[in-house]
Amino acid sequence: MNMKMNKCPDCKIYTMEDACPQCGGELKVIYPPKFSIEDKYGKYRRILKKEAMNKKDD
């Protein structure tokens, strides 16, 4: 068992178990990634944000 809070994307249940207690499915970690001055994925995040804004305007 890990000591981080997880969430089942199907059941929307929060737990600290390794598998969802209701459906037995895979869990996702809910914590954001650590902050880094050298933002490796900033370029991609900005591209996705720009695309989302363009879709919203259409």
Curated annotation (Swiss-Prot):
Keywords: Ribonucleoprotein, Ribosome biogenesis, rRNA processing. The keyword Isomerase does not apply. Involved in ribosome biogenesis; more specifically in 18S rRNA pseudouridylation and in cleavage of pre-rRNA. Belongs to the NOP10 family. It holds the Pfam family Nop10p. Disulfide bonds: none annotated. GO terms for biological process: pseudouridine synthesis; rRNA processing. One of its GO terms (molecular function) is snoRNA binding. This is Ribosome biogenesis protein Nop10. Signal peptide: none annotated. InterPro entries: H/ACA_rnp_Nop10 (IPR007264), H/ACA_rnp_Nop10_sf (IPR036756), Nop10_arc-typ (IPR023532). GO terms for cellular component: ribonucleoprotein complex.
